[in-house]
């Protein structure tokens, strides 16, 4: 019974294109929520003991400590259902009552349709003509990885393309994909060094996480390859400021940084802001105009519009 419930949850989530599944403990029940794009929807409330058992089932499959319900844990697994496999990342933590919550991130290893409100892939691709470093920023689930893979197919067809990811999210036969495994020394730093020996035309680096990775990404860009990577920031200006915080100099950025793309999924589609220079002075007028248009066309509410606008103070 527990396994059947778990499989039905994953089946339903995959059908909806869900990025995240939330098991939220309440006083005497569990609430189940799913996030699709920028919307987090409540699916229902369920028997507490039954869904606590479902959480234990997922933890067991992911190799986590089933008996530990207070401390946070991370896990991952390839979950089998209906003769299919779903790649999952799990995170658990207990609240003050010792009731455990679970978040499951679904890695959709097949390509997802990426719909933009005001641009298409061909139009966006015109911004990526020069060799060097291109950075993609935006929240989790905003389509950064999908956009990087779409651009790699349209701009680097038949060329040497490599990726370094943690984990590999979209499996591609037309590129060499490497996956982090720090336990055996496969760190971002080491894999970047290894990949450069293969002389890639495009190197996709999953995420700039720290100063070490930032320095390695800059060095890779200086070899003449085109490099795509993601970074956590809330705007184009924020990307530039984050790189400086990580120890990359303005002189280095002037040489290697060819473009910054900031994107979000809003109202069921993506919107993009792009800059190829003057990152520190970038204005949010184009972004805010797109938000205003979505509001005018009835795709978002006035509250959403107010929340999604960017203001540089």
From Swiss-Prot:
One of its GO terms (molecular function) is ATP binding. Gene3D superfamilies: 3.30.450.90, P-loop containing nucleotide triphosphate hydrolases. Keywords: ATP-binding, Cell membrane, Membrane, Nucleotide-binding. The keyword Membrane applies. It is found in: Cell membrane. Induction: Part of the putative comGA-comGB-comGC-comGD-comGE-comGF-comGG operon. PROSITE patterns: T2SP_E. SMART domains: AAA (SM00382). One of its GO terms (cellular component) is plasma membrane. It is a peripheral membrane protein. The keyword Phosphoprotein does not apply. InterPro entries: AAA+_ATPase, ATPase_ComGA, P-loop_NTPase, T2SS/T4SS_dom. ATP binds at residues 138-145. Disruption phenotype: Abolishes detection of ComGC in the mechanically-sheared fraction of cells, probably corresponding to the pilus. Required for uptake of DNA by competent cells. May be involved in assembly of a complex forming a transformation pilus at the surface of competent cells. Belongs to the GSP E family. NCBIfam families: ATPase_ComGA. This is Competence protein ComGA.
């Amino acid at each position: 019974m527990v396994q059947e419930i778990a499989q039905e949850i994953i089946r339903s989530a995959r059908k909806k294109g869900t990025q995240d599944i939330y098991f939220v403990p309440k006083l005497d029940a569990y609430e189940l929520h799913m996030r699709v794009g920028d919307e987090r929807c409540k699916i229902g409330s369920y028997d507490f003991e039954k869904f606590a058992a479902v959480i234990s089932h997922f933890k067991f499959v992911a190799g986590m400590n089933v008996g530990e319900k207070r401390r946070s844990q991370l896990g991952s697994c390839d979950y089998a259902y209906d003769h299919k496999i779903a790649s999952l990342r799990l995170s658990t933590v207990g609240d003050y009552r010792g009731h455990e919550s679970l978040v499951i991130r679904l890695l959709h290893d097949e390509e997802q349709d990426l719909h933009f409100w005001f641009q298409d892939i061909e139009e966006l691709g015109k911004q990526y003509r020069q060799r060097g470093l291109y950075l993609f920023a935006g929240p989790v689930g905003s389509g950064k990885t999908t956009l990087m893979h779409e651009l790699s197919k349209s701009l680097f067809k038949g060329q040497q393309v490599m990726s370094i990811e943690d984990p590999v999210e979209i499996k591609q036969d037309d590129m060499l994909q490497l996956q982090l495994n720090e336990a055996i020394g496969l760190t971002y730093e080491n894999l970047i060094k290894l990949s450069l020996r293969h002389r890639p035309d495009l190197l996709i680096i999953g995420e700039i996480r720290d100063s070490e990775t930032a320095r390695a990404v800059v060095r890779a860009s200086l070899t003449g390859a085109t490099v795509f990577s993601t970074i956590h920031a809330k705007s184009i200006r924020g990307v530039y400021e984050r790189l400086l915080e990580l120890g990359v100099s303005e002189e280095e950025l002037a040489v290697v940084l060819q473009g910054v793309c900031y994107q979000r999924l809003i109202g069921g589609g993506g919107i993009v802001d792009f800059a190829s220079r003057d990152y520190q002075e970038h204005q949010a007028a184009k972004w805010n105009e797109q938000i205003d248009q979505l509001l005018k066309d009835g795709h978002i509410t006035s509250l959403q519009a107010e929340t999604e606008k960017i203001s540089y103070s």
